A protein has these predicted regions:
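Active-site core of metal-dependent hydrolases
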Residues: 165-266, 277-283, 288, 306-310
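Metal-associated gating/positioning segment near the N- to mid-region
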Residues: 53-111, 128-133
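Short amphipathic alpha-helices and their capping/turn segments at secondary-structure boundaries
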Residues: 40, 45-47, 51-53, 104-111, ...
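Hydrophobic faces of well-ordered beta-strands that scaffold small-molecule active sites
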Residues: 58-64, 95-97, 118-121, 156-158, ...
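N-terminal metal-binding scaffold of metallo-dependent hydrolase/deaminase domains
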Residues: 1-44, 50, 54-55, 340-345, ...
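Acidic/histidine-rich helix-loop elements
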Residues: 66-77, 127-138, 165-171, 246, ...
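His/Asp/Glu-enriched, well-ordered alpha-helical/loop segment
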Residues: 187, 259, 264-341
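Histidine/acidic-residue-rich, glycine-tolerant segments that coordinate divalent metal ions
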Residues: 101-204, 208, 212
């Protein structure tokens, strides 16, 4: 029998208990939640809130920008709070913020009842090669120290290519500068992500040993070989580019820009398949706007990932790759529950029947 209470507990409620098939393994297990943490051992006096059904580690948006009221504008804390509420009630228990107009306050990164946040500080870009008003602008020789400085919360991000004055999309930094940045960030125990939408910059980033490639529409097969060799991962954010298709291919756009975008859009599923075939983890990320994570999961499935791997890209795979809680004993309690297997219908992911985020029940169907 598949049941859940549908009633969020009060702050004084007892420890919680769930029983169901836990993905990705699919084995029937019991989970207890006490003091905001997972217990794989029975906890006395617990209240059963779900029995039967399917339990997943809460969703993860592996590439998102929160608190953005307008492109190029400052960080808006009211928008940030609204974004966090939306993610929480959508069953998203963690998000990797890959670049913000300013650094997020440390006290916001892991709070009970809200998603756990990984952040890359302010993205590091070349002069005149990023969105006006955003980014930390540096010349080639200062890329490495800037990236290391921004990596104080565990991640740094390079805008490795951008639109140039000629209307083309090409590298912003030399191969040597990217190699030095990777070495500097890894030297302090942090990781580095790279925005790339050109084959040259993508190849340079992968060869340098970056930890993640973001977008990568034009990533060549050789770059995927290097990414695999360095145990990197891919976050394609493909759905956002599908949404931009009409405007980017409009006849009012420069011909070179239209060609670049059309070729990248056509190549993007092949990049996903190439990553899959090389054993490179593919994670689900939305970029902007907030709230399209399930659309990205659907896009990944349509682009060649199995339903199992597409769901994993927004759940257990992301959590393992990003070293987030994933239903182990003493992990932070972040999970979602469904009466039926969401791999059979990805649209189910839009409305978790029960979500526990940061140890607190945040969503429950009546």
């Amino acid at each position: 029998m598949t049941t859940h209470t549908g009633t969020p507990p009060t702050p004084a409620s007892p420890p919680l208990h769930l029983q169901g098939r836990i993905l990705p393994e699919g084995e029937v297990c019991d989970i207890w939640i006490a003091d905001g943490r997972i217990s794989r051992e029975p906890v006395g006096g617990s209240e059963t809130i779900a029995s039967g059904g399917w339990i997943l580690p809460a969703l993860v948006d592996a590439h998102v920008h929160l608190g953005i009221a307008e492109i190029g504008g400052p960080l808006d804390f009211e928008v940030l709070r609204n974004d966090l509420r939306h993610l929480t009630h959508s069953g998203v228990g963690a998000a990797r913020i890959l670049g913000s107009p300013e650094r997020l306050p440390a006290h916001m990164l892991s709070r009970p009842g809200e998603p756990e946040l990984l952040t890359a500080g302010v993205p590091v870009a070349a002069f005149d090669r990023f969105i006006p008003g955003w980014g930390r602008r540096v010349p080639d020789r200062l890329l490495a120290p800037a990236c290391a400085d921004e990596a104080r919360c565990g991640w740094s991000k390079i805008i490795a290519d951008w639109l140039g004055p000629d209307g083309g999309y090409g590298p912003s930094f030399s191969a040597h500068a990217i190699e030095a940045a990777v070495s500097a960030v890894h030297g302090i125990g942090a990781r580095i992500a790279v925005h790339t939408q050109s084959s040259v910059a993508g190849a340079r980033a992968a060869a340098a040993g970056v930890d993640s490639i973001e977008h990568g529409m034009h990533l060549p097969p050789s770059a995927l070989d290097d990414l695999a060799a360095h145990s990197g991962f891919l976050v394609p954010t493909g759905f956002v580019f599908e949404q931009l298709k009409e405007s980017m291919l409009d006849s009012s756009q420069p011909a070179d820009l239209r060609r670049w975008f059309a070729e990248g859009l056509e190549n993007h599923p092949d990049v996903v398949i190439g990553a899959r075939d090389r054993g490179i983890p593919v994670l689900a990320g939305t970029d902007l706007p907030v709230g399209a994570l399930v659309d990205e999961v659907v896009w990944l499935h349509r682009s060649g990932l199995s339903a199992h791997d597409a769901v994993g890209a927004a759940s257990w795979t992301s959590r393992e790759v990003l070293d987030l809680s994933r239903l182990r004993h003493s992990d932070r309690a972040d999970l979602i529950w469904f009466a039926h297997d969401p791999r059979d219908d990805l649209e189910m992911l839009r409305s978790p029947e029960l979500a526990v985020i940061g140890g607190e029940v945040s969503a429950a169907a009546p």
